[in-house]
Amino acid sequence: EKMLRIIDPSTDLRDRLPSISTAVAPIGSLLPNIAHELGLPSGIPVAPGGGDNMMSAIGTGNVISGVVTMSLGTSGTIFSYSQTPVIDPQGNIAAFCSSTGGWLPLICTMNCTTAMERMRELFDTDLGSLERNLSAADRGAGGIVTVPFFTGERTPDLPNGKACMFGLDSQNMRQENFLRSAIEGVTFGLRNGLKLLTAQDIPAERIVLTGGGANSPT
């Protein structure tokens, strides 16, 4: 209410806004035309829901302690359910609320599938060729190490960070090694995020993948 008064002290903005509801409280029912379009029963309850990661948590069973969701999209997010707020003194963990009445401590890396897209563009390769190259390369990518900060980085906090490749020589400069090295760099960034979560005594008994990157067989 205080914030609304600051925005416009001349009127009560509460009259201009919808009522506040919880993520799971029914606020209406599915209209027949929309139900037909979606292939769902007409009249089923509709609730406000929540943000993308909050809904991913529900969809991956991340509603109890011990489950960690790893979302592989443009950015990479790693989060877990907690019954109490998790406050990270270093500021790496976002202290989000969940949509199920608890909290959702979350780590975000800026470069996940976007790093692989940059590499695919560089080599003008499609997803099928990418998968074959990743399978053909050995672990360690022949010694090539990629720091995949193509868009800076949030975790660690390096907004002006740049992507780099190390360890190139005349023996390992093959397409499959470059691609493998990029995905290994992304993976180590996610691993670092998981370590930051578990360092706050967040248990990781089960990890569930979601997001576009989760469709990759490799």
Regions found by a protein language model. Give the residues of each.
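Active-site beta-strand/loop segments that form the cofactor-binding cradle
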Residues: 17-18, 39
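Domain-core and long-helix interface of multi-subunit machines
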Residues: 16, 22-25
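Active-site core segments that coordinate phosphate-bearing ligands/cofactors
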Residues: 1-11, 26-218
